[in-house]
From Swiss-Prot:
The keyword rRNA-binding belongs to this UniProt entry's keyword annotation: yes
Pfam families, per the entry: Ribosomal_S8
Domain of life: Bacteria
Protein name (database record): Small ribosomal subunit protein uS8
GO biological process terms, semicolon-separated: translation
Single GO term (MF): structural constituent of ribosome
Source species of the chain: Prochlorococcus marinus (strain MIT 9215)
Record note on quaternary structure: Part of the 30S ribosomal subunit. Contacts proteins S5 and S12.
Gene3D superfamilies reported for this sequence: 3.30.1370.30, 3.30.1490.10
GO CC terms of this entry: ribonucleoprotein complex; ribosome
Protein family (similarity comment): Belongs to the universal ribosomal protein uS8 family.
SUPFAM superfamilies the UniProt entry points to: Ribosomal protein S8
Annotated function: One of the primary rRNA binding proteins, it binds directly to 16S rRNA central domain where it helps coordinate assembly of the platform of the 30S subunit.
PANTHER family: 40S RIBOSOMAL PROTEIN S15A (PTHR11758)
């Protein structure tokens, strides 16, 4: 089955695994997925990233984080913003603050994929890929 939107597929896999309280989830490997996963790890939403395989058979295994004794998921919501049919671009001043700064907007810029905070610090805008909180 072909996948026309690998970013949405990645977000859905993470969302479903965290709702079922799985410790890890596997996503198809790509440079974009790996970049998004690194931003999520840097922001504290996932615990670890492991890559398996090479080429088109590569996979990324993500370790999910939970808090409290009831294992409440660290990721409460993930929303895709810019889609293949409707791309959303924002300049530095228009970059969104998710939940007043508690969440993260993941931005694809000319200097790579980064969080909205990093993009503001560097003074660059880009395509708003998703919101995570």
């Amino acid at each position: 089955m072909s996948n026309h939107d690998p970013i949405s597929d990645m977000l859905t896999r993470i969302r479903n695994a965290s709702q079922k309280k799985h410790t890890t989830t596997t996503i198809p490997g790509s440079k974009m997925s790996l970049s998004i996963a690194k931003v999520l790890q840097k922001e504290g939403f996932i615990s670890e990233i492991n890559e398996e395989g090479e080429g088109y058979k590569s996979q990324i295994i993500l370790g999910l984080k939970y808090s409290g004794k009831n294992k409440f998921p660290t990721i409460r919501s993930m929303q895709r913003v810019s889609k293949p049919g409707l791309r959303i671009y924002k300049n530095t001043r228009a970059l969104p603050k998710v939940l007043g700064g508690l969440g993260v907007a993941i931005i694809s810029t000319s200097k790579g994929v980064m969080s909205d905070r990093d993009a503001r610090k560097q003074g660059i805008g880009g395509e708003v890929l998703c919101y995570v909180y």
